Design a protein with these regions (language model features):
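Glycine-rich loops and low-complexity Gly/Arg-rich segments
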Residues: 37-42, 97-101, 128
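Conserved, mostly hydrophobic/aromatic
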Residues: 47, 65, 96, 107, ...
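Generic alpha-helical propensity signal that fires on short helical segments
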Residues: 29-31, 73, 91, 96, ...
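N-terminal amphipathic alpha-helix/helix-capping segment at the start of soluble metabolic enzymes
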Residues: 62-68, 91, 128
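Glycine-rich phosphate-binding active-site loops on the catalytic face of alpha/beta enzymes
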Residues: 80, 89-93, 97-118
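Short gly/ser/thr-rich secondary-structure transition/capping motifs
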Residues: 85-87
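C-terminal helical cap(s) of enzyme catalytic domains, especially alpha/beta-barrels
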Residues: 1-7, 97, 109-128
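Conserved anion-binding
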Residues: 1-54, 58-63, 70, 74, ...
Length: 128
């Protein structure tokens, strides 16, 4: 991270908290005994201490991340209809923005099926 900071005008350093495909059960299976929200909060504090430029977290944890990380927040796990598929911690774009997300990562809700129709649905969702 120190090397990144030396060239910080060119490169942005972004930290990832806990993948949106993981929930408390999955975390326990890999050896973590803390609640996912507590782990995300801890990771956000570390990101702040490391002076990262942005952080990636589930839209469900944005509010707790904002308590300790004041820079940009990027949120994957965005679903228009909340069908989670393999993701565990998802919200709609409107909910994510309401929680304080700065940037959304939207993959399958756009790329699965008719892309043009999906983009129009997304625009419609955001304009309501």
């Amino acid at each position: 991270l120190r090397a990144c900071k030396k060239i910080s005008g060119k490169i942005k350093s972004i930290g990832v908290t806990i993948l949106t495909s993981l929930d408390n059960k999955a975390l326990k299976e890999i050896g973590f005994n803390k609640d996912v929200r507590k782990l995300v909060y801890h990771q956000a504090k570390l990101a702040n201490k490391a002076k990262l430029d942005a952080i990636v977290c589930s839209p469900q944890e944005v509010a707790i991340v904002k308590k300790v990380f004041k820079k940009e927040i990027i949120t994957p796990g965005i679903r228009l209809n909340l069908k989670a598929h393999d993701q565990k911690r998802v919200l709609t774009p409107k909910q994510a923005f309401k929680n304080g997300s700065d940037w959304l990562v939207i993959g399958r809700p756009i790329t699965k099926g008719n892309i043009k129709k999906n983009i129009l649905s997304l625009i419609d969702h955001l304009s309501q």
